[in-house]
Amino acid sequence: MIMPQTRLVVADNTGAKEIMCFRILGKKRVAQVGDIIVASVKEAVPRSNIKKGDVVYAVVIRTKRTIKRKDGSCVRFDDNAAVIIDKEGNPKGTRVFGPVARELRDKNFMKIISLATEVI
């Protein structure tokens, strides 16, 4: 469950390390895996394309909140993580670190799925 003011780890190589959500796109109060959020960069690597204070779009790829699946299984991750995307929904980075939830496939984020090392 990602709400406004929630800080997320950035799981790609764009140069941002941490972002803070301040808007969830769509008519939702909380964001789950696969939802698009608008966030502000709170921590960034020096000399990268994305600077601290930049406003970015991101898609949530991992949450600490348990994800219940239709087959009865439950999945939970150790951190809240997101991947920075552009307005068309393509990831800005070329690598995705850590596992990614399978729910992204249902939301048609195939590019992120293909960049991920592990899909759970």
Swiss-Prot record:
Biological process, per Gene Ontology: translation
Sample GO molecular function, one term: structural constituent of ribosome
Tagged with keyword ATP-binding: no
One of the record's GO cellular component terms: cytosolic large ribosomal subunit
Keyword terms of this UniProt record: Ribonucleoprotein, Ribosomal protein, RNA-binding, rRNA-binding
InterPro entries cross-referenced by the UniProt entry: Ribosomal_uL14 (IPR000218), Ribosomal_uL14_bac-type (IPR005745), Ribosomal_uL14_CS (IPR019972), Ribosomal_uL14_sf (IPR036853)
Signal peptide feature range: none
Subunit annotation: Part of the 50S ribosomal subunit. Forms a cluster with proteins L3 and L19. In the 70S ribosome, L14 and L19 interact and together make contacts with the 16S rRNA in bridges B5 and B8.
UniProt-listed NCBIfam families: rplN_bact
Role description: Binds to 23S rRNA. Forms part of two intersubunit bridges in the 70S ribosome.
Family, as annotated: Belongs to the universal ribosomal protein uL14 family.
Protein name in UniProt: Large ribosomal subunit protein uL14
Lineage: Bacteria, Pseudomonadati, Dictyoglomota, Dictyoglomia, Dictyoglomales
